[in-house]
């Protein structure tokens, strides 16, 4: 896959596809969050009157005039909300991107679709790519060209991986700590990964740290999946699968392929449960076949709460 192909896909998204039409009506900044207070701009100060919310009272300003007169702070939630794609760029993902796999195309479509939708409602968009280190960080900026620049940054990583192959797994703690130390303002954080590291190791995610971030930021996780990877097409009942790290093929039986697929589905369901109940993070599993409707339904369900 080449960068020109991705730009062409993004231009198609820009001119309107089914998913974008559904998601354009959703302002991502409207999602509710556990974060309170500092996400608002102070518009002005005036006298508090009975019937107005008690939480608006500025007690520090009212100390000298209490109880005869109380003052309130008028706050307004900013319409602009920075969006940051937190994208898994481990060796396996970069390999899939270079090969143009369905899962890789799904990732790029999601970045293009959501990114351009955010740009259309004048929200700055950025990128945080990670493996077991921070691979790239693009600060959120306004405009459609920013989304194309993000795609270009990802492809530069692909080219670097081609020239100087490195085996790097996804360590989710790395971006979480980066976010905790660097992002002072509230963001929408869109975590995109195939979650294979969690499938292989349940301890791959620090749910406590994730919960701390989710309390401050509007956070969601989009889990990439492709059931077709383990569909047996051979009449002999065997399937060839690629080792994402070595580019070698392995032949496995239909029974083993089915067992692997069931394990992946079970672990992904477990991951979604733990994300919700341990960290308060909404998530959805998206496939190349269902992502158009599933993404729109997921976002609409979040705004309805």
Spans of model-derived segments:
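A short beta-strand signature within small-molecule sensing/ligand-binding domains used
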Residues: 69
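Exposed, interaction-prone extracellular/peripheral surfaces
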Residues: 1-31, 37, 47-55, 61-63, ...
């Amino acid at each position: 896959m080449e960068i020109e192909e991705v730009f062409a896909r993004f231009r198609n998204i820009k001119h309107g596809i089914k998913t974008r039409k559904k998601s354009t009506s959703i302002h991502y900044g409207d999602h509710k969050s556990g974060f309170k207070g500092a996400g608002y701009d102070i518009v002005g100060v005036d006298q508090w009157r009975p019937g107005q919310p008690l939480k608006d009272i500025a007690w520090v300003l009212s100390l000298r005039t209490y109880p005869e007169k109380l003052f309130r702070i008028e706050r307004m939630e900013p319409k602009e909300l920075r969006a940051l794609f937190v994208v898994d760029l481990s060796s396996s993902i970069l390999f899939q991107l270079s090969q143009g796999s369905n899962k890789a195309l799904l990732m790029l479509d999601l970045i293009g679709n959501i990114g351009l939708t955010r740009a259309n409602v004048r929200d700055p968009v950025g990128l945080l790519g990670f493996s077991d280190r921070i691979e790239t960080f693009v600060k959120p900026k306004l405009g459609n060209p920013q989304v194309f620049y993000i795609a270009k940054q990802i492809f530069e990583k692909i080219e670097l991986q081609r020239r100087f192959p490195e085996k790097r797994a996804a360590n989710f703690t790395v971006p979480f700590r980066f976010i905790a130390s660097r992002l002072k303002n509230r963001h929408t954080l869109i975590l995109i990964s195939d979650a294979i590291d969690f499938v292989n190791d349940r301890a791959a995610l620090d749910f406590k740290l994730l919960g701390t971030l989710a309390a401050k930021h509007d956070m969601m996780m989009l889990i990439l999946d492709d059931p077709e990877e383990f569909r047996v097409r051979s009449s002999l009942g065997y399937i060839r699968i690629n080792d994402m790290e070595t580019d070698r093929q392995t032949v496995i039986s239909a029974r083993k392929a089915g067992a692997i697929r069931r394990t992946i589905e079970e672990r992904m369901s477990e991951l979604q449960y733990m994300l919700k109940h341990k960290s308060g993070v909404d998530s959805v599993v998206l496939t190349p076949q269902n992502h158009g409707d599933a993404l729109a339904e997921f976002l609409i369900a979040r705004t309805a709460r």
